[in-house]
């Protein structure tokens, strides 16, 4: 009995570590841990966060984002998700550097979700870059408790 409990705990820890550290590599770009927070209401805007690493010798730009489960996707300069006028045309990713897309900085905003997002769900998203082209990623939906408080 104790061995079975230990195996269950070990599997849960391994699953949690894997879920927290997933990444997608394509050419010179690595997309690290794309995630968002669960929602109870499909009408609520969703902020998607991730880190984009460019290991190449040339800069790139995130030009577009698409997801099949949403009516609209936007690249945002910052500010609250419900603010108007924060859309930007692209996010630069300089050579040999990384960009953190998250609340308080540039981020991805999804609106018009087809259904609420439950914790531990995931959904596909396509990121289109100027040089690297299209990169398919899987966005993990995390519990609300994963959201770090913003420093105002």
Predicted regions and their residues:
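Compact, glycine-rich, soluble single-domain proteins
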Residues: 22-152
């Amino acid at each position: 009995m104790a061995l079975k409990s230990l195996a269950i705990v070990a599997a849960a820890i391994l699953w949690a570590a894997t879920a927290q550290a997933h990444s997608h590599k394509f050419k010179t770009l690595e997309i690290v841990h794309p995630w968002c927070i669960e929602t109870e209401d499909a009408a609520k805007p969703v902020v998607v966060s991730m880190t984009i690493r460019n290991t190449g010798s040339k800069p790139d730009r995130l030009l577009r984002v698409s997801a099949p489960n949403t009516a609209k996707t936007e690249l945002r300069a910052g500010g609250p998700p419900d603010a108007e006028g924060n859309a930007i045309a692209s996010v630069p990713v300089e050579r040999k550097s990384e960009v953190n897309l998250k609340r308080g900085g540039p981020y991805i905003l999804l609106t018009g979700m087809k259904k609420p997002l439950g914790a531990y769900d995931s959904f596909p998203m396509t990121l289109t870059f100027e040089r690297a082209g299209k990169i398919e990623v899987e966005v993990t939906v995390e519990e609300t408790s994963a959201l770090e408080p913003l420093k105002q």
